[in-house]
Amino acid sequence: MPSIDVSLPLSLRKRAMLASALNLLAVFASQVMRLGGNLVITRLLVPEMFGVMAIATTVAVVLQLLSDVGLRPNVIQSSRGDEPLFLDTVWTVQVIRGFVLFLLTLLLALGAKFTQYIELWPAHSTYAAPELPMVLALSGFAAIIYGFQSPKVDVAIRVFQQKKVVIAELIAQFVGLIVMLVAGYLTRSIWSLVAAGLLSTLVFTVLSHLVFQGPRNRLRWDPAALREVFDYGRWILLSSSVGVLAMQGDRIWFGGSMSVAELGVYSIAVAILGAIQSVLLRLAGAVALPAFSEATRSGDKERVRSLYYRSRVLFDLTSLFACGFLLTASPLLISWLYDDRYAGAGNTMAILSLSLFTLRFTLAHQLWLALGLTKYVAMDNIIRVVSLFILLPVLMAIGGVSYAIWGVALHTFFTLFLIFPVNRKLGLLDLKREVVVLPALLIGVFFGEMITSLFT
């Protein structure tokens, strides 16, 4: 079976470094657009609209992850990841999944309308917002569009040829940004957010077929490839199904206990923090996973171990510094960026920034995926969701929403009881290296305090 022709003239290290630099530039440009658009649109729309959109986004993410069988990681990790028949099998599964997700979203939209009709929710609840059912229905169409995205994008990531990926993503985001701002200015409605999301997804899907190297995708599948997809993806499916509750459980829970405006303010804090998280997650998925996978296929365990800890340096220093800095400087940053309606997001973001302490172990998850040890990723997510859904109701009962936010920030710390033993078993635990980076946290706290003192 012929493969897609991709040349690899550079060493793994050089290709990973180039990919890292490219992705950092891409994330920076993306976050500038996102933050700039966010600052403008929050002045055009009222906080309640962001609360409704937060629920719609949560529903979309939940459904995506509940049906996630790891198609992209499979393409990146598999020895068959550049074979046209294998890629067509992946694409066919992805298309079918998109239609199924859209139908499920429509059912949830009808369910939301019915619960409003019988007045199941308190009048102040986000779930009682009259726009919610239609926002859900229209936003769900993005699942169909995304389903047609070409797996040639995944091949480009697999071999570190990511320039086109970055350009396509930025073009799609820019189109969505322009649509959001123009429609927001003209209509002052939540539909500007919905339209922006749909058009951005459509643009990237079209570009994925037009600009990436490889034969045209066809709807077909190979039984052997299909078995490999589901054998690899079964633990990822469990992991994602459980992990989605950990990732989105706070908004699901707060949707019933916060007012629409409060959830809108909370979503602003989550979005700003998410901008930092996305930098690390982007590098993990687009650089670390392909690098770990290639090193793993070589069979050199010492090379894998060395690559893991070299990669950890940037992640550890960045996440620990950001954790300390935002812990002390978040209220000031929010006061600079937003008007008084969003002031409450400052203290919320300060608390949530503690989650950055454990985000640095994302690289362990990527290494487990590269080694095919997807069951450990599933176990990690099980710990997250159990911890979150124990802490949320307990802290809510003790001190209300303000206490429950601490549960969102701290629930990931329980995963360390899995990460350290597993990495020790794999010969990847070096306590000296784990400890030596911790001063970056204190340096971040110091800089945050210093800037806050200077400007308040």
Where are these regions (language model features)?
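Interhelical loop/hinge segments that connect adjacent transmembrane helices in multipass membrane
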Residues: 2-12, 16, 121-125, 191, ...
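Signature of the first transmembrane helix
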Residues: 2-3, 12-71, 102-117, 137, ...
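Membrane-water interface segments that mark the loop-to-transmembrane alpha-helix transition
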Residues: 3, 14-31, 56, 65-120, ...
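Membrane-interface "helix-start" segments
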Residues: 19, 89, 164, 228-235, ...
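Short runs within selected transmembrane alpha-helices of multi-pass transporters and secretion channels
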Residues: 26, 30-34, 38, 56-60, ...
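Helix-loop interface residues and adjacent transmembrane-helix termini in multi-pass membrane transporters
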Residues: 44-47, 159, 186-187, 248, ...
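Helix-loop junctions and terminal segments of transmembrane helices
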Residues: 66-83, 88, 157-158, 269, ...
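Interfacial segments at transmembrane-helix termini and the short loops linking adjacent helices
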Residues: 112-138, 317, 326-357, 402
